[in-house]
Amino acid sequence: MFCVQCEQTIRTPAGNGCSYAQGMCGKTAETSDLQDLLIAALQGLSAWAVKAREYGIINHDVDSFAPRAFFSTLTNVNFDSPRIVGYAREAIALREALKAQCLAVDANARVDNPMADLQLVSDDLGELQRQAAEFTPNKDKAAIGENILGLRLLCLYGLKGAAAYMEHAHVLGQYDNDIYAQYHKIMAWLGTWPADMNALLECSMEIGQMNFKVMSILDAGETGKYGHPTPTQVNVKATAGKCILISGHDLKDLYNLLEQTEGTGVNVYTHGEMLPAHGYPELRKFKHLVGNYGSGWQNQQVEFARFPGPIVMTSNCIIDPTVGAYDDRIWTRSIVGWPGVRHLDGEDFSAVIAQAQQMAGFPYSEIPHLITVGFGRQTLLGAADTLIDLVSREKLRHIFLLGGCDGARGERHYFTDFATSVPDDCLILTLACGKYRFNKLEFGDIEGLPRLVDAGQCNDAYSAIILAVTLAEKLGCGVNDLPLSLVLSWFEQKAIVILLTLLSLGVKNIVTGPTAPGFLTPDLLAVLNEKFGLRSITTVEEDMKQLLSA
């Protein structure tokens, strides 16, 4: 096992990365190794998808499957070894079908890629794990060095984050052939074990630029189906009655669940990154979407144990449900998996609803505590002139984009302290689950404009980027000249690709934490600092002073 893709990875003087029987996320060495094997199979599939496009062949089954299967290897998504192998087998079957299509056009069609003809050696998981050793990401570290390995992983993990957003967009009916062609090209190239530093740096920026387009179609999919989010108050306390909790990012799953629970007497609560759903008109119209439950994903083993109903996980993040003894009432959807947990193959939630009706639910309603969400792209752009007016009248000094992933590390309290230290004449724009560090606190307003503005899920960084570009255009300056600072927390691969997106767009002087990615060497961090001004957090006092004086 070698996995260094998330923020909580093991860090030692000898090197970084989880390489024992189990990773810090709970992933076993078996599952981790089989995920490496799956990635190799997906690289071979992409190599043939690139070749097929040369013949004008676009296989939509391949295009829809490839990012979805890659998504299953993202942190805290799928811990089920047999399902990972199932994805690998499907990748090979699709590859062979695509290969046959190519050969039907050109009998001499071939692909020069070491993954292009990969076959699984056995049905036995142990044998497959031994085969996977050929594809462990650091297998040639001694030959290429830590810097090249780090750049490879930056590209691989960044592309994995983009693949997750591609799947979210695809579920909502969004498809862009150019994006899929670019994805396959990059995925196939990474399967050749590239070792050119400049080419890898260029690839990382290409991934960032591609992901901006992915976020654009995801935004179109969400707003096209569910309307543009508008500011909405959400209750974060319990309401009496039977209940279901839904977590993850998939708004379509939430919509289907709301439709199927309507009139059943079962209330629905959002959790984690599903919180922004309350801002969408076509979702909040369901009166039994009664509120948001819990806090950051890392607290789920305590909070889920206390929730008196079933739980549905639609995407990341799931962690071991046996710890809180709720594994008999947690359900996985789509690419999510945990051994022994019931999985919903389709969009029928009747079994979950039946379980909810058999459980006690909340016995009484607590005193409501309301927070505000729903500052989507249209709302943000509608406030652009107000922001400019406040800045011109020196009522608004600075805007801090304070968001990203949450996690268990104690140093993450920095983000709570930073939020509460932001001066009263400054505004906090937040997104993603890092907001749970401070989103239940009171921040007041500046002439009626809330000082805490919740823009949505991690992918809604797109809205923040569009706002920044709009403000810069209206003020006749560059984005980096705005009174705007980005202080981002990271945990997994979606955050990595958001960072690459920002860097590829030329955004500079981003501050990240709580620690630097374990796969980035001091040399690589120095390069990123020199090129983009990217740096790690220090103390709240020092960072606040530096950012306000910039």
Swiss-Prot record:
Main subcellular localisation: cytoplasm
Gene Ontology BP, a term: response to hydrogen peroxide
GO cellular component terms, semicolon-separated: cytoplasm
Binding site for hybrid [4Fe-2O-2S] cluster: H249, E273, C317, C405, C433, C458, E492, K494
Superkingdom classification of source: Bacteria
Tagged with keyword Ribosomal protein: no
Functional note: Catalyzes the reduction of hydroxylamine to form NH(3) and H(2)O.
Pfam families reported for this sequence: Prismane
Catalytic activity, reaction form: A + NH4(+) + H2O = hydroxylamine + AH2 + H(+)
GO MF annotations, alphabetized: 2 iron, 2 sulfur cluster binding; hydroxylamine reductase activity; metal ion binding; peroxidase activity
Compartments reported by the entry: Cytoplasm
Listed name of the protein: Hydroxylamine reductase
Residues that coordinate or bind [2Fe-2S] cluster: C3, C6, C18, C25
UniProt modified residues of type Cysteine persulfide: C405
EC number, UniProt record: 1.7.99.1
SUPFAM superfamilies with a match to the protein in the record: Prismane protein-like
Family the UniProt entry places it in: Belongs to the HCP family.
Cofactor dependency: [2Fe-2S] cluster; hybrid [4Fe-2O-2S] cluster
Record text on cofactor binding: Binds 1 [2Fe-2S] cluster.
Enzyme class, UniProt record, top EC level: oxidoreductase
Alphabetic keyword roster: 2Fe-2S, Cytoplasm, Iron, Iron-sulfur, Metal-binding, Oxidoreductase
